[in-house]
Amino acid sequence: MIRFTLSQLAAIAHGERQGSDVAIDEVTTDTRKVTAGCLFVALKGERFDAHDFAEQAKAAGAGALLVSRPLACDLPQVIVNDTRQAFGELAACVRQQVPTRVVALTGSSGKTSVKEMTAAILSQCGNTLYTAGNLNNDIGVPMTLLRLTKEHQYAVIELGANHQGEIAWTVSLTRPEAALVNNLAAAHLEGFGSLAGVAKAKGEIYTGLPENGIAILNADNNDWLNWQAVIGDRKVWRFSPNAANSDFTATNVQITSHGTEFTLQTPTGNVDVLLPLPGRHNIANALAATSLAMALGADLAAVKAGLAQLQAVPGRLFPIRLTESQLLLDDSYNANVGSMTAAVQVLSEMPGYRTMVVGDMAELGAESAACHREVGEAAKAAGLDCVLSVGALSADISRASGVGEHFNDKAAVVARLRELLAEHKIMTILVKGSRSAAMEEVVRALQETGTC
């Protein structure tokens, strides 16, 4: 990150400095990640107040504090009205000091995949920074921006939200040249109230574009019509694996044992691509990533090379061989209606006895039962052989699937899976649920017990 002094921080955040004007090379909001001489940002939430841990941060080696009230702790401090806002303002200042070319993306599902794909392509062109993990909220985005240096030629920033206004804030810090909403689905409905609320929140990403920026839209979602007022006269690119009139599309699609092969069509020409990831939905993700990367000047050679080097990551359709003919797909990291139905499609194209193991989908509010039934109906339409559910809500999935069984605990699910593995020599299992469902426990148990 770029070094700054406390007096500079005070000026940026309209705060008051107390104590020495020390220089800062590292920033953290977590006492477990304190490094010698770093700035500890004391955030305050509904259930916590990090001001209470200032002495702990000092003991771990922190060199200064960013606080919203003066503390007796014997460390230099900058006192501001709101540490969360000041943290963002500091990140915005760092962003303004670097020549890095930046793109930003959001969406209901596939954000991380698109981020990883975009970064893989841009890394073929130069030094690229991208969001680590899922640090995509109003704390994670500033933390990512603070990692920028003048050596970074490109940056790919993922933006997430669980309430209105969050993306408007984080995109104002990010200042991207191109921005994209990957897709829209029922996710975080408790925070947004409806799918229309989700669309409004995600569309905030386009408010951060300059007049000559590029707004990238999923042509398969009609919600972009609601964003026209935000996008204005900015240049628009559309992507879709289905719509032939899109700027970025795919033809000659072939699903192989190595992944997915297709011809990627772009405004500057076509290129044959091997995407070493399962699932047709990843074609759409690859088109989205290509559009973002090409907005910053990536060529077709970089696109082809970048996509070819991708690897599945645990929790996101990660393939695990139980036996030579029995495959476990670990998609347990998270779930909403869009990603669940995409997973159904992936499983439907796999060999053998196709079994989906599902946990609850969280944060769906009043639409929860309907959303779970929708996934079950998708499983039925896709012709899956078996759906096993566990959790208070997911019974609606197995019931609507027509081939389902519901269980009260994961141990019972694992026991049933072991029976099915013994019965079916060729079998594919896909495990998925929201983060709170902790479906990785099923994956881990299957790996530990195998098929005996």
Residue ranges and their predicted role:
Residues 47, 313-315, 332-406, 452:
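Active-site beta-alpha connecting loops in nucleotide-dependent enzymes
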Residues 8, 86-219, 224-232, 419, ...:
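Phosphate-binding loop of NTP-binding sites
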Residues 105, 111, 314-318, 436-442:
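ATP-dependent carboxylate/acyl-activation modules
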Residues 1-89, 93, 278, 348-352, ...:
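N-terminal leader/targeting and accessory segments in enzymes
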Residues 67-74, 178-327, 352, 377-386, ...:
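Acidic, Mg2+-coordinating active-site environments of NTP-dependent enzymes
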Residues 33-42, 146-155, 344-365:
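Mobile, glycine- and charge-enriched loop segments
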